[in-house]
């Protein structure tokens, strides 16, 4: 995983060139938006339990068979595993947002996730639905449209951060589909 600075330096070094022009402008933008990024990560962290439990509850409401005998969320152990997986996925989304780089998702979260879920008999469509609910919830928190919030409102336009988070969620959904 490379942060924005390491990525720029690595690219410039590979070209045997100085860092300048558009690379410096991109870093300036990254720095100026840094407080928004930190606030967004803080909102995810502060509301993670609610975001994940709402996503899993929503997934189950749409597919009640998941909590019937034989369903993938039936028994406390399986429900706990489902909630744990949701927390892990959301945690890696927050890491990617903090770094401004999605490679942490590929390297540490998505690599082999689909195969593991298939081997365990986890319905991938339910996973995709839970991720889409998390995407909507996180987007609402970041863009200040969530009805219940913990903390202050992020100042300024955060649509770029909301779009970035949406792209991470879409990447996760595509990886497990």
Curated annotation (Swiss-Prot):
The gene is rpeB. It is a peripheral membrane protein. GO terms for cellular component: chloroplast thylakoid membrane; phycobilisome. This is R-phycoerythrin beta chain. Heterododecamer of 6 alpha and 6 beta chains. The basic functional unit of phycobiliproteins is a ring-shaped hexamer formed from two back-to-back trimers contacting via the alpha chain subunits. The trimers are composed of alpha/beta subunit heterodimers arranged around a three-fold axis of symmetry. The phycoerythrins also contain a gamma subunit which is located in the center of the hexamer. The light-harvesting antenna system in red algae and cyanobacteria is formed of phycobilisomes. These are composed of the phycobiliproteins phycoerythrin (CPE), phycocyanin (CPC) and allophycocyanin (APC). Cyanobacteria also contain phycoerythrocyanin (PCC). The phycobiliproteins all share the same subunit composition and organization with variations in the covalently bound open-chain tetrapyrrole chromophores. It holds the Pfam family Phycobilisome. It comes from Agarophyton chilense. Light-harvesting photosynthetic tetrapyrrole chromophore-protein from the phycobiliprotein complex.
């Amino acid at each position: 995983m490379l942060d924005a600075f390491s990525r720029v330096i690595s690219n410039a070094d590979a070209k045997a060139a100085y860092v300048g022009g558009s690379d410096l402008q991109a870093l300036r933008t990254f720095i100026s938006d840094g407080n928004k990024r930190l606030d967004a990560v803080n909102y995810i962290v502060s509301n993670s339990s609610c975001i994940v439990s709402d996503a899993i509850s929503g997934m189950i409401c749409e597919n009640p068979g998941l909590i019937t005998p034989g369903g993938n969320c039936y028994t406390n152990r399986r429900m706990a595993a489902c909630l744990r997986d949701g927390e892990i996925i959301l945690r890696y989304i927050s890491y990617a947002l903090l770094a401004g780089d999605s490679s942490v998702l590929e390297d540490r979260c998505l690599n082999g996730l689909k195969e593991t879920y298939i081997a365990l008999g986890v319905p991938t469509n339910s996973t995709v639905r839970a991720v889409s609910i998390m995407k909507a919830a996180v987007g609402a928190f970041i863009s200040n449209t969530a009805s219940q919030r913990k903390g202050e409102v992020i100042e300024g336009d955060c649509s770029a951060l909301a779009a970035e988070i949406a792209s991470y969620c879409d990447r996760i959904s595509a990886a497990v589909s």
